[in-house]
Regions:
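Short gly/ser-rich loop at a beta-strand->alpha-helix junction or flexible surface loop bordering the NTP-binding
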Residues: 1-119
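Surface segments flanking catalytic/ligand-binding clefts of nucleic-acid enzymes
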Residues: 100-188
Length: 188
């Protein structure tokens, strides 16, 4: 099979195909314009039966696919599932919730991805929230949830409006900035 790239083709999918695979995992999620934590490596998904390099090039991580992929970039849902399965819980939830928040992944599909997790990661499902609007919110919410501190994402507070996180009964946390909420504050 031969591949052809037009001049506007981004470099990451081209590199992945030249390495014998497909753009996958975190790299594919970035290509699909999801918010992903900082990761400089190129993640290459290899079709079943394809040999993995004995010594991968520096800055490249290879992942084995269970079913073949015919495109140069893994479909969004498959790429998100790879991140959730292969990375730490925090990274997986950040990417999963980014996909849901962007409207590119239905919350039911996100829950389906979480159901497929191995037992050692299954607890992550209890922390999933379709309400997170940024990776920073997911990261902070998860920090409190892991410590069993009550936290409510996107809470509505009378006289204030919607806040990123309500921790306990009275602590308000704005994860990213006040910009999304400042218009409401200016009206008071």
């Amino acid at each position: 099979r031969q591949w052809f790239a037009v001049q506007q083709t981004p470099t990451e999918p081209i590199r992945a195909v030249k390495l014998g695979g497909r753009l996958g995992c975190v790299s594919a999620c970035r290509h699909h314009e999801l918010w992903v934590p900082h990761d400089r490596d190129l993640h290459v998904a290899m079709n079943p039966g394809r040999a993995l390099p004995v010594k991968p090039p520096a800055g490249v991580q290879f992942h084995r696919l269970s079913t073949p992929c015919a495109t140069a970039v893994l479909p969004l849902e498959d790429a998100v599932a790879q991140v959730v399965q292969r990375h730490d819980v925090e990274t997986g939830l950040i990417v999963l919730e980014s996909a849901v928040n962007s409207g590119r992944l239905h919350p039911g599909d996100a829950r389906h991805i979480l159901k497929g997790l191995p037992a050692r990661k299954a607890r992550a499902a209890q922390f999933f929230s379709p309400l997170a609007e940024s990776g920073s919110e997911t990261r902070l919410r998860l920090f409190f949830q892991r410590r069993r501190i009550p936290v409510q994402p996107q809470a509505r507070i009378p006289g204030v409006g919607r806040v990123d996180l309500l921790v306990g009964r009275s602590w308000i946390v704005e994860a990213d900035s006040t910009a999304p909420h400042s218009a409401r504050l200016d009206e008071r």
